[in-house]
Structure formats: structure tokens, C-alpha cells
Amino acid sequence: MTSASITNTGNETMNLPQMRSIWLDEDEEAEKLYGLQAQQFMGSDDEENLGITFINSDKPVLSNKKNIELPPLSPNSHPSCHHRRSNSNSAKSKESSSSSSSANKTNHKKVFLKLNLLKKKLLGAQPDIRGKGISTPFDFQHISHADTRNGFQDEQLQEPSSLSTEIKDDYTSSSSKRDSKSLNKAFVTERIPANRESKLISRSHENKTSRLSVARSISVTSSNYSKNTQGNNHSINGRVVSTSTMATSIFEYSPNASPKQFKNKSHALGHRYTNSTDSSESSLDFLKNYNFPTLLEDKPILDFLPRSQRSSAYRSLLETPNSNKDSAKAFFPSRQSPLPKRRNSIATPSPQSKFSYSDSPVNHRKSFDDVLYSFNQLEPLQT
């Protein structure tokens, strides 16, 4: 924003100071300016009235449009006026001193020259204040943004050089000492030194745990590194070795290994239940010895017996109950609750089934409680 005005005060013309720029630092001030533009284009609302009067050259607001009287400016507000007044005063003094003798003139000139030389030596060359100074009309306070470029430019210039040196040091040097600048970033962890890593590799070869590739699992390396640091430094603040990190090791992959080698390793481990290496035989033996969880359907239990034993079982069931007590006990023992009775078990009722499988017809649908009760009855026969 630039503005200039000239006023006639008597016979002399005085240039008012110019307001060259306004920097808004606060967001609220910027919102006021945007809201002021919205009021001009859309109309003002009583609720959101900002209370700002905008003075425009097209629509003057002041009543007195000509010969505006202004208070006299202080000499500090505008250095150019003070400079002109001092020049005029010096000119008047020169005119008055012309009547004096020539010896006094030469003496005064010599004194002024000596004073100027001393000022230049002590203060140096003074820059032009008019070009760089900010005008302050009517005690206006200049608002400017905080200059953050000076603080961040040095860091931006130093970052690429420091990064390049750090990368070279990681691959060339084996020392663990680093500059403090490299650790001024978030999520930075120190790399395992090369000499300690070589010791870990030699120890792993001695314990017959050779690695297949350089890319080891993170859990094993972290646990081994913590062991090494605790053993060498004996520090209280050392890392605590946890069993969870040591137990998460997996098969390591190497680019030179073929898929046949992995198959041979899996076959050499053997089956989980049998020690045989043949996968087909182990699966058959596992299926033969495995007890599948069965759920009884509408068919009676005797249908699960072999065909040669079904006829004898049916005949024994069709006989009279008095003559077939022993056979009935063999297949269906006495109805008792599977839960053991206690002395103080009056308040806990025991589950009782209404009928057994021998009394029920063939096509009768059983409930789940009856199926559980039948399994509890047949448990002694299986053992």
C-alpha cells in the first residue's frame, strides 16, 4: 500500500511521509480484511458488523476536502525535513559569517573537516537512512512477519552435505562414534558396528548355527546385540533381553538356495506324530489312529457295529428283560447321573434322561442331551 499527499501550509509546501507497506502477522487481521471485502460486495449484516470504515479516494469521507490542517511533525518522524531545516540554518549562518574575517572562515572550515574525519574513522561510512527506513506517519506502528528464513537457511544448506558424509561413513568407517547432528532427527537408531557384527558371526559359526544369508531376522539380531552390549559394558541401563524376541526366529531365505533344498528340509523334519520320513505313510497312519469326533444322527448306535455283529445284538435286545439282564448291562449299564453325588447336593439337581436308546424306536429323533448321556454310558466299554 503506497500513498503520498502534499499540503499547502502557508507559503511552504511540505511532503507528508509515505506509508509504504503493511504486513499483517495475525490471522484475525486478515479475516477482518476478507470480511470487509465481503461486506462491500454482499452488503453488511448487523450481527457480523466489523466496525471498520474504509476510506477510498473515489468516495471521500472527510468533510473538509481542501486545506486539511495537520499538526506539525516531530523531527524524528521524518529525517528529510530535519535535514532540510539544518541545511537552511547552516546557510543562514554562512551568510552571517561572511561579514566576519577570512581568518575565522578558514579556522571554522578546518574544524569542521577535522570533525568529519573523526566521525568517519570512529563510526565508519553511514548508510542512507532514507532508502531503508520505514516511515511512521501519525505514530503508526509497523507490523511485519517474523523472519524465519535466516534460522532455517543454514540448516537446509548443511543437510545435504551432512547426509552425504554420513552415508560414506556408514559404508567405509567401522567406528561407532557419530556426530551429534546425525541424531537430531526422529526415529534414528544406531547401526550395529562392524567389529561387533563380525564377533557375532564367529560365535554363531562355533555354535553350529550358520546363517544362510546376510539378511537375518530382526528379533535374533536384536537379542544377540543386547546380550553382547550387556556382557561388554556391564551397564545398568542396558537393554533387557526378552524371551518373546528370541522365540520369533524363522527360516531364513537366501537367493542361492533352490526350492528343492527347502523341500528336502521339510521332509527331513519328519511327521508331527510319527518319526517316518515318508509323507504318504505318515498321513495314512495318522488317519487310521485318529479318533474323529462323531455326532449321532437318527440311526441307532447298533448301526455303527459291523454287519456280522448287528444280528446278534438285535436278537439280544428283542429277548425278555428278565433273561437279558446281563446282556443289557454289557451294552447299556445302569442309568446314573454322570456327575458324582455330594453330601450337600440337595439344591443341585442331577440331569436325568426320560428314556434310553433301548426303549426308543428306531426312527425316533433324539435330543442332544440324550446323545451326551449315551456317550457317558459307553465310556467304560471303550477303555
UniProtKB/Swiss-Prot annotation:
Question: What InterPro entries does UniProt report for this protein, alphabetically?
Answer: CRIB_dom
In this chain, the stretch annotated as Disordered covers 63-106, 155-189, 319-361
User: GO MF annotations for this entry?
Assistant: phosphatidylinositol-4,5-bisphosphate binding; small GTPase binding
- Supply the alphabetized keyword list: Cell shape, Cytoplasm, Cytoskeleton, Phosphoprotein
The residue ranges flagged as biased composition, category Low complexity, are 87-105
Signal sequence span is: none
**Comp. bias intervals (Basic and acidic residues):** 166-182
Q: Give start and end of each CRIB domain.
A: 134-147
From what superkingdom does this record's organism come? Answer: Eukaryota
Modification Phosphoserine, positions: 254, 258, 337, 345, 367
**Compartments where located:** Bud neck; Bud tip; Cytoplasm, Cell cortex; Cytoplasm, Cytoskeleton
One GO biological process term is: regulation of exit from mitosis
Other remarks? Answer: Present with 1130 molecules/cell in log phase SD medium.
Oligomeric form and interacting partners: Interacts with GTP-bound CDC42.
Q: What family does this chain come from, according to its entry?
A: Belongs to the BORG/CEP family.
Q: What is this protein called?
A: GTPase-interacting component 2
State the encoding gene: GIC2
